[in-house]
Structures are given as structure tokens and as C-alpha cells.
């Protein structure tokens, strides 16, 4: 909102959000023997969380909103639940690629986009190193 209202304080909000993220990481590590979970464990947890959100949480929110006469809000909760379903699928797909060791391999030509600079490559694998920003291939994602 600060940026929209042309105040030059939006950077303060962004910096504070980044600080809060780091604080959360500290607490998470303290609760998990100083470690962050593996990517595979994080994906499994994300799948579980998204599944809960789209099968229970947002439906319950929608039911309560409708009971209280807020049908427009209930409809938004239902729609957000549908978005959460796509999040679950996205995480499940990534988990499957990781398990099958195909995160950076494809049987067909695939569009690979650098998540750092936007460079686009087509092939069965991303390049070993980005031709623009020179980040390694793990910074590429399928389109």
C-alpha cells in the first residue's frame, strides 16, 4: 500500500518482512535440532498442508461465512480452496520429479527458464551454466 500511495517507505516494509522471515528460520531451526528440513521433506509437508487447506480449511471457512450471511466471502474462500488444490498438484509434481531424479532431465525438449535472469533455453536438460547470469543449472525451472 505504501508503494501504491507513493510513500518512500515500502522498502522498510520489505526489509522488515525479510527480517521476520529470518527470525522464523531461527525458531524453526531451534525446534528441529539446528537444521532445516530437506527439500524432499519440505515438499512432502507442503503437499500435506495444501491438501488440508483445499479439502478442509477453506471449505470450513466458506461454510461459516455462508452461515453468517457472507455468501460473497464464502465464494472467495471456495475459490481460494481451488487455488490451493493447484498448489498441491504443483508440489506433488515437483516431488515426483525429485524422487525420479528427473528434476533437471526430460524425455522431450523442454523450455527451461533461469529463475535469476529469465534466460530461456530449450532442450532435454538445462545448460550446465546460464549463458547470461552464469548461475548453475539448478537455477533453471521448467516452464
Regions found by a protein language model. Name each.
Residues 1-143:
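Non-heme di-metal
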